Amino acid sequence: MNPYKVFIVGHEGTTGLRIHERLSGRKDITLLSISDEDRKNIDVIASIAKDADIVFLCLPDAASKEVVAAIGDYPCKIIDTSTAFRTADDWAYGFPELGESYKNDIKTKQHIANPGCHASGMISCIAPLVKAGIAPVDYPFTITSLTGYSGGGKKMIGQYESEPKDYFLYAPRQYGLSQQHKHLPEVTHVCGLTEAPIFMPIVDDYYSGMEVSVGLHTRLLAKPVTVEDVHAALVDFYKDSTIVKVAPLNLEEDNKQLLNANKLSNTDGMVISVTGNNDRMVVHAIFDNLGKGASGAAVQCMNIALGLPEETGLSL
């Protein structure tokens, strides 16, 4: 069988580079290239895409829209990593763990929107609870997300890795203060929520890794539940996943059991944990913002779209 032809548009960015790293050693993939002079030439991009099986778009929103329009009806599958199409009904949403309908959309639709990193964590915690009838769609979620600085792209990486480094970069920094973070629309859309969560993203002085934490007051849930009930619902939801795993209960607060945001750095998996008590509990998702939060998820979607085992070429 001939190798699949894959074209990464925007391969010089953080996500594009990681996708390239994951695919460059695979014998079943041939990477199509574009010259530096032509990398922003829409006509050349479309011409190369015409010969590809898969096209990854690792571009800003406006540029992604322009390239999608230029590619038009060419038979290639497009996997877009921007926020441009994540709530579009005619695009597949690239989180196959949400159910067979999502996985089937990834297999059959021409266009696939790769989830945002923060959104991946939020949705992975919230969607199972909504589906199980535990969390009502109008629940007032408050969510924190701790991420490494690679999530800010090349500019932020440069800030954190420059010498001398600004004094304030040594401490965690909260952003998205206006509650208008660009990942909130897809969370509300995919989970079917009637209100967007309060969301507090925080960037810290480490390269990659993410911990998203969703707090729950049980008195506000749709039905009485215990920590064990919530854990069981999550275990059932992810029972068939090879990529998202649910940690055992009874995590102890000692040096061996602290939740570390960079625990899964340089991997493509995700671990869900439940902590707290029967009055107040927290559901956590730990993963790499560049892995399951970006390039790893994109490669997973490519594998599904090509009919390959979804974990092919991933680090788990």
Tell where the protein language model's regions lie, with residue ranges:
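C-terminal helical cap and adjacent loop that interface with cofactors, partners, or active-site loops
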Residues: 239, 261-316
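Short glycine-rich loop/turn motifs that provide flexible caps or phosphate-binding loops at active sites
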Residues: 9-15, 115, 147, 208, ...
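Predominant activation on well-ordered alpha-helical scaffold segments within soluble catalytic domains
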Residues: 20, 123-130, 184-188, 231, ...
